[in-house]
Amino acid sequence: MAKLRMEKKGRGGKTVTVVYDLPNNAAFLKELSQELKRACGTGGAVAENTVELQGDLRDRVRDHLMKKGWQVKG
């Protein structure tokens, strides 16, 4: 199950969508990050077993992950 949250604190007022509770596999995280960035048309990064995307993209990310068969919370 993947979980989503939105963060602003400590980011200069910028909004970031964080996908966490993902499998601890660097190749998987990199591939998922690329996929989500393409699907949402935004930038992002992989950091400490999470995928961070620029902007409040929770709805788009939730829809994309659910289409791939993931259970999503948040």
Per-region residue spans from a language model:
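Long, charged, low-complexity intrinsically disordered regions
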Residues: 1-47, 59-74
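A generic structural motif
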Residues: 50-55
